[in-house]
Amino acid sequence: MAALQPVRGTHDYLPDEARSHRHVEETARTVAERFGFGEIITPIFEFTDVFARTLGDTSDVVTKEMYTFTDRSGDSLTLRPENTAGVARAFISGGLAQNVPVKLFYRGPMFRHERPQKGRLRQFHQVGVELIGAENPLADVEVIALGSQLLGALGVGGRTILHLNSLGDPESREAYRAALVSYLSGHRDSLSRDSLERLERNPLRVLDSKDEGDRAVVAGAPRLIDHLNEASRAFFAGVTGGLEALGIPFEIDPLLVRGLDYYGHTAFEFVTTDLGAQGTVMAGGRYDGLIRQMGGSQTPGVGWAAGVERLSMLMAADRVGAPRPLAMIPAGPDDEVEALKLAHALRQGGLFVDFGYSGNLGKRMKRANRINARAAIILGGEERANGTVVVRDLDSGEQETIGLAVLEEFLARFL
């Protein structure tokens, strides 16, 4: 029955996947806090104008992928396809401009109506950071360094490569736009319909096309990095010099552009070859005009977002395992309440303790093995009378009788 299946492009995260998912999020939060970033939580839907004004009316996100609906009040609302615009809106409405620079971390679901495939869902999850209010290129370096440290903390840093490019300032992009239009106009017959439309409205988007014919044309296109003015070159040199000083390796990718209109100057991606077509696991850049475009004062910003699902897939070989619990086993029905009390006390002490609710001693032991328990704590009438329990090591099969007064200390060996 179709109604019993998840909606196309969505996914149920059962315990093992959910554990890996949360591990990515919590690791990201920990690393972000190490860099001085505080968590921000924004709504999963915004007024449609928040995205339509900022992402660009020629972007695939706005023209093809947004989940937009009209609510009962007649307002046009959109499930967030990304969160930089939402964070920027919160920066303005929350009055955070008084305290720049502001460092913000976020996590949560995003929504895009894309063709579902491995590593690409219609409801997906991201972690991300935004550093708002710093125009120094070292802010870009710090944001990239945070991303690099996160990948390292997840154990996948050695399987990713940092790609870097400069989109320059508006003056540089305008000079490049003229050169690019001239080149692409000579290859109209080879461009896809989408790219022909982009050529008229926003030619830089042609560089981001995934169409094979477009890619062949783009391979011979002039490079934006060759059209940077002196100020843009100096800014980019500050970024590359900072990365070199921190020992963060990178590759210059002259065709790298961001798919959203608000980016300028630094653009970057951490890419892997281990996930096939969905090789970008983290992407970001600088957006100095976004806050003003949304109605705030001129305020620079830089940030990135990373796909939780893709990072989790990349970590699959090193899947985060569940803590092996201890199994609390009452020997019989008369021992259940006391066993539950003991389990409760051990949990309050920080131990992972499972308690089964039915079955004789043999069936409860089978359950302990099925859940991969590290040890079984057996409590019967004799043990209750003596203030002891029997602790059985389920790996070795050895068991000992232990007094309750020293039980927590004894169980520490199984952690």
UniProtKB/Swiss-Prot annotation:
**Reaction(s) catalysed by this chain's protein:** tRNA(His) + L-histidine + ATP = L-histidyl-tRNA(His) + AMP + diphosphate + H(+)
Any single biological process term in GO: histidyl-tRNA aminoacylation
Q: Where exactly are the transmembrane stretches of this chain?
A: none
- E.C. designation(s): 6.1.1.21
Catalytic class of the enzyme? ligase
SUPFAM superfamilies cross-referenced by the UniProt entry: Class II aaRS ABD-related (SSF52954), Class II aaRS and biotin synthetases (SSF55681)
Give an example GO cellular component term for this record. Answer: cytoplasm
Alphabetical keyword list: Aminoacyl-tRNA synthetase, ATP-binding, Cytoplasm, Ligase, Nucleotide-binding, Protein biosynthesis
Chief subcellular site? cytoplasm
Gene3D superfamilies xrefs: Anticodon-binding domain, Bira Bifunctional Protein, Domain 2
Q: Which GO terms describe its molecular function?
A: ATP binding; histidine-tRNA ligase activity
UniProt entry tagged with the keyword ATP-binding: yes
**NCBIfam families linked to this entry:** hisS (TIGR00442)
| Family per similarity comment | Belongs to the class-II aminoacyl-tRNA synthetase family.
Quaternary data: Homodimer.
What is the protein name given in its UniProt record? Answer: Histidine--tRNA ligase
Q: Which organism is it from?
A: Rhodospirillum rubrum (strain ATCC 11170 / ATH 1.1.1 / DSM 467 / LMG 4362 / NCIMB 8255 / S1)
